[in-house]
Regions:
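Transmembrane alpha-helices of multi-pass small-molecule transport proteins
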Residues: 35-88, 115-119, 170-178, 192-210, ...
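Cytoplasmic-side transmembrane-helix entry/capping segments in multi-pass membrane proteins
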Residues: 10-14, 72-80, 128-140, 161-162, ...
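Hydrophobic transmembrane alpha-helices of multi-pass small-molecule transport proteins
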Residues: 54, 128-150, 265, 277-296
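Specific transmembrane alpha-helical segments of multi-pass solute transporters/efflux pumps
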Residues: 61-103, 145, 228-246
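Hydrophobic/aromatic residues within transmembrane alpha-helices
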Residues: 30, 42, 46, 96, ...
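Juxtamembrane helix-entry segments on the extracytoplasmic side of multipass membrane proteins
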Residues: 5-10, 35-44, 68-75, 133, ...
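Helix-helix packing/entry segments at the starts of transmembrane helices
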Residues: 17, 45, 86, 90, ...
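Glycine-/small-residue-enriched transmembrane alpha-helix faces in small-molecule transporters
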Residues: 1-44, 154-181, 201, 303-310
């Protein structure tokens, strides 16, 4: 692997994460411009459209996306991935953006890796290392600063934002853990494409798209397309391609560009006002996730041992 390949991977992953952050800003703009647009409607449109595009792309590159349905167990896992992983990470995130703003929603969602660490501690008996422990304390303090602004007897953000943001962080964990057994066999394009598409279809139970009449201007449709194409499909393909050049631990470090881009673009284009507590708390959470990512080799070695045992 040459240095040029490594830099290419870093660049691809960085741009992908920035695009994910920008999609949150685009959603926040859309919610502000058109109050008839709901988080549920936007999530359905995003998931169904992006999922269909990824599946078509998978078919074009001969990834055989329909192979995943030949076994009942893999089909059920795809459905659970969509409903328990992708729905909370996308719908709950958009709800947090709608009731709050993109930077705060993205930063709270960024706590997802620590939920994964807690899961492995409780159910896989993996004791956190010292760096992980330090990271968890940093993340807790950062969250406390954002939520209370230093006043421990009151909340500085709406409880609704905190609840939706917390659910989206849990979604990050389930979104990572549930599809893991499927990825080596079927590939990320097929697994993610089906997860998005199935989840988007299932969300019609709560609000059928054909019964929702939302009138959008050309500019608002442009924001929807930006969220689908530049905020979902393109960054996913770029990030998946980047993993061919860089380690997953390096890629997860670059995830920090998502809350950073959401913050910068929200301040520039939406005039979102963030307090010193928000900025310091967000910085602590981002640094905490970096500490966790740098310690990721231990978790990777754990997976290798488990695979060897089975």
């Amino acid at each position: 692997m040459t240095r040029q390949h490594h830099l290419r991977g870093v660049l691809l992953a960085s741009i992908a994460c920035m695009l994910w952050g920008i999609s949150g800003v685009a959603a926040s703009t859309l919610f502000t411009l058109n109050h008839h647009v709901t988080a549920l409607w936007l999530t359905q449109i995003r998931m169904i459209s992006a999922g269909a595009i990824l599946l078509i792309w998978g078919q074009l590159i001969h990834a055989q996306p329909f192979q995943i349905w030949r076994q009942r167990a893999t089909g059920l896992r795809v459905i659970s991935y969509g409903l328990l992983g992708l729905v909370p990470v996308q719908l709950c995130y958009f709800e947090a953006v709608k009731f709050g703003n993109a930077p705060i929603a993205t930063i709270i969602q960024f706590l997802g890796p620590f939920i994964i660490s807690i899961y492995y501690f409780l159910f896989k008996h993996m004791t956190p290392t010292r760096p992980e422990g330090i990271g968890m304390v940093m993340a807790f303090v950062g969250t406390l600063l954002i939520v209370t602004h230093g006043h421990l007897t009151s909340l500085a953000i709406s409880p609704v934002v905190l609840i939706w943001g917390g659910l989206s962080a849990i979604g990050v964990a389930t979104n990572t853990l549930i599809p893991r057994p499927l990825l080596p066999k079927f590939g990320a394009v097929a697994v993610t494409g089906w997860g998005l598409f199935v989840a988007g279809i299932c969300l019609n139970v709560f609000g059928p798209l054909w019964r929702v009449h939302v009138t959008l201007t050309a500019a608002e449709w442009g924001l929807v397309l930006l969220i689908i194409i530049f905020g979902t499909v393109i960054p996913f393909l770029m990030f998946a391609h980047a993993l061919g050049y860089i380690l997953p631990t390096t890629a997860s470090l670059l995830d920090a560009f998502e809350p950073l881009s959401a913050t910068v673009f929200s301040v520039i284009f939406l005039n979102v006002q963030l307090t010193t507590f928000d900025l310091v708390g967000g910085a602590l959470i981002i640094l905490a996730v970096m500490v966790l990512s740098l310690n990721g080799r231990k978790m990777m070695n754990f997976f290798r041992r488990r695979r060897a045992e089975t």
